[in-house]
């Protein structure tokens, strides 16, 4: 049998994930194939927050589901650290290692709970991936408290908790695996404003802990708040990859999209239209309304 040749790993020391010419077609063997990902290529740096945006059906969730092997590519290559995922593979080697490296927090993760205690639910992933029950139990307590729930919750039945508490338990279970890459798919769906703020803080904390984070979202104010890089998808194609300000201030590009600007950016554009001195705000790059107010005061003070 002819041995299949694995491509050379292209990743450099500061890179964690590379995608080369990835394509995905659903219903490929029918008369109505649907191309969901169209020749996507990008190399992702370590310890960055990447926000993936685009219209519904643009391929965002399908893309990230390739990263941890949930969907097999029809064409192209993916490297997650030293783990290779390719279209010609029958199965992924080191699949358990891949699961330890990259985890997805799906939309409404609370619906994934199934054990009779919170502790067992959080322990499930780490134990399944080879950790001892002792270590998993310690991590269950640690990550549950990180999510704002105290030790007594470990013995509670997850189905007796509120919706917000269930979501915290589900996320604690994923954090307990301690993956290097975290993917959040619409993490603020169904949350109140306080819950949104807590989720954004969790994502910032993940970066502070040297993790690489992906976030799929339609909430542009959250993109501005946390993203290092924004990737814009349209009909399965990568049409732009840049910083939030480079994306949101590119009027020529925006005119071709349905992106709704975050309030901070809209205010900046309105102020620039009144007085060119406010172009200074683009350099200061405020990420939220509080920072914007401070930046406006600073700009006014400097220009009288």
UniProtKB/Swiss-Prot annotation:
GO molecular function: ATP binding; ATP hydrolysis activity; ATPase-coupled transmembrane transporter activity
EC number: 7.-.-.-
GO annotations of cellular component type: ATP-binding cassette (ABC) transporter complex
Subcellular location: Cell membrane
Residues in ABC transporter domain copies: 11-260
InterPro entries: AAA+_ATPase, ABC_transporter-like_ATP-bd, ABC_transporter-like_CS, ABC_transpr_CbiO/EcfA_su, ECF_ABC_transporter_ATP-bd, EcfA2, P-loop_NTPase
Keyword hit for tRNA processing: no
Binding site for ATP: 54-61
Any single Pfam family the record assigns to this protein: ABC_tran
PROSITE patterns: ABC_TRANSPORTER_1, ABC_TRANSPORTER_2, CBIO
SUPFAM superfamilies in the record: P-loop containing nucleoside triphosphate hydrolases
EC class: translocase
Key words, A-Z: ATP-binding, Cell membrane, Membrane, Nucleotide-binding, Translocase, Transport
The keyword Cell membrane belongs to this UniProt entry's keyword annotation: yes
Membrane topology (UniProt): Peripheral membrane protein
Predominant cellular place of this UniProt entry's protein: membrane
Family listed: Belongs to the ABC transporter superfamily. Energy-coupling factor EcfA family.
Described function: ATP-binding (A) component of a common energy-coupling factor (ECF) ABC-transporter complex. Unlike classic ABC transporters this ECF transporter provides the energy necessary to transport a number of different substrates.
Subunit structure: Forms a stable energy-coupling factor (ECF) transporter complex composed of 2 membrane-embedded substrate-binding proteins (S component), 2 ATP-binding proteins (A component) and 2 transmembrane proteins (T component).
Stated name of the protein: Energy-coupling factor transporter ATP-binding protein EcfA2
């Amino acid at each position: 049998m002819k041995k299949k040749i694995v491509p050379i790993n292209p990743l450099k020391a500061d890179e964690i994930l590379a995608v080369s010419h990835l394509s995905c077609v659903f219903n490929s063997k029918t008369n109505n194939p649907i191309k969901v990902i169209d020749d996507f290529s990008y190399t992702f740096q370590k310890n960055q927050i990447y926000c993936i945006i685009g219209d519904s059906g643009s391929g965002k969730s399908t893309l990230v589901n390739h990263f941890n092997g949930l969907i097999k590519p029809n064409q192209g290559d993916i490297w997650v650290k030293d783990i290779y995922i390719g279209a010609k593979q029958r199965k992924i080697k080191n699949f358990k290692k891949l699961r330890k490296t990259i985890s997805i927090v799906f939309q409404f993760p609370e619906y994934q709970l199934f054990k009779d205690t919170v502790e067992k639910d959080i322990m499930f992933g780490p134990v399944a991936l080879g950790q001892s029950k002792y270590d998993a139990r310690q991590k269950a307590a640690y990550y549950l408290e990180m999510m704002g729930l105290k030790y007594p919750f470990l013995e509670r039945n997850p189905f007796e908790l509120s919706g917000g508490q269930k979501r915290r338990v589900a996320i604690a279970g994923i954090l307990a695996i301690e993956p290097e890459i975290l993917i959040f798919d619409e993490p603020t769906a169904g949350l109140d404003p306080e819950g949104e703020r807590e989720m954004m803080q969790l994502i910032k904390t993940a970066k502070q802990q040297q993790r690489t984070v992906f976030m799929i979202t339609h909430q542009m104010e959250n993109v501005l708040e946390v993203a290092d890089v924004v990737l814009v998808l349209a009909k399965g194609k990568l049409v732009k990859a840049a910083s939030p300000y480079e994306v949101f201030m590119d009027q020529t590009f925006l005119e071709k999209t349905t992106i709704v600007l975050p309030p901070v950016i809209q205010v900046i554009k309105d102020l620039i239209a009144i007085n060119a001195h406010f172009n200074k705000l683009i350099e200061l790059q405020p990420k939220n309304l509080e920072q914007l107010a401070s930046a406006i005061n600073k700009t006014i003070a400097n220009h009288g």
